[in-house]
Amino acid sequence: MQAYGTNAQALTSLAGLSFPAAAAATRPLSLLNGWQSSQFAYGTGDPAYTVAGGVVYLSGSMYQPSGSSSEFAVLPPAARPRHKLWIETYTYNGAVGALEITPSGVMDAFNNTGNAAQGYTSLAAISYPVNS
């Protein structure tokens, strides 16, 4: 793990950071509606999920070069929440975006300022309890 910036040595918070502690099977997300992996441009990994210890971990990043649907994937039953989740995430140019994950597994990416979510949406460091 690395921390960057001139103040990183003074304070680097790890609050909210989580990842699977043991090796667990990572599964690719099948992207829909023109959404594509941003791995080639940013080296962030292809969009994927891992279920370990009752927690779902998302990873990778994506963008949507064409199309207008915010729906980008559908999770399998073993990785779905019990209730609708809204989770903040990083989108293009530092804009704050959100993921909506429904009990049926539908995953959507949004942001309030134009089409930043379509330009880039990160799934890194997003996790939630299974059946949450």
Regions found by a protein language model. Give the residues of each.
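Extracellular jelly-roll beta-sandwich "head" domains, especially the C-terminal globular C1q domain
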Residues: M1-L31, F40-G45, Q64-V74, P81-S132
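Glycan-recognition and catalytic regions of carbohydrate-active enzymes
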Residues: W35
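Extracytoplasmic/periplasm-facing segments of secreted or lipoprotein envelope proteins
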Residues: Q39-V55
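Short, well-ordered beta-strand segments enriched in hydrophobic/aromatic residues
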Residues: G54-M62
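Short low-polarity hydrophobic stretches
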Residues: V56, P76-P77
